[in-house]
Amino acid sequence: FGSGVGLNSFAVVTIGIGVGYSLTVNGEPIENPDKSYGLVGHTLVDPDGPRCISGHKGCATCLTDNSIATEYSEMIGHPATFDEFAAAARASKTQATNLVNRTCFRLGTLIATIANLAMPDKIMIAGESSFIAKLGVGDLRNGINMYRHSQAAPVDFEIADHDWAMWGKAAAAQAIRQYVG
């Protein structure tokens, strides 16, 4: 089931409370003992972006809900939650829309980096905040195109609606595969 069926390789990037990344090749997820350290979160996506709690400037951690809420709060001049940002973005409020576009360009930069290095057949964008990518898909494409060679194949990507049931099915499928083969 799902968008990865029939593909030789695919990557999944998640945005929300954190930033996640996984790669599947020949139907098998790439396993590594370092996978739980959130390594993709410290990939540079905007040299002028905000600092993360580790002190990195412009790393992919700026795609997390907390970082977006902080950046939005600075833009509007008072504290705001991520949910307030999301409501303003969905209502096309100017400052929220500007941050959506900036965030999507940054996400596109991350997608291009993954496409350039891992060369998956497709990249899925998922997570509880993936709706942001749908609001700024033009800037997402601009971010990809900025860092993707013009003669390389276009990056095939899909923005998934967040669905906890799909996460559960994916986990169940992995467990079943281990026992059934």
What residue spans do the PLM features occupy?
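Phosphate-binding/catalytic loop of phosphoryl-transfer enzymes
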Residues: 1-58, 176-181
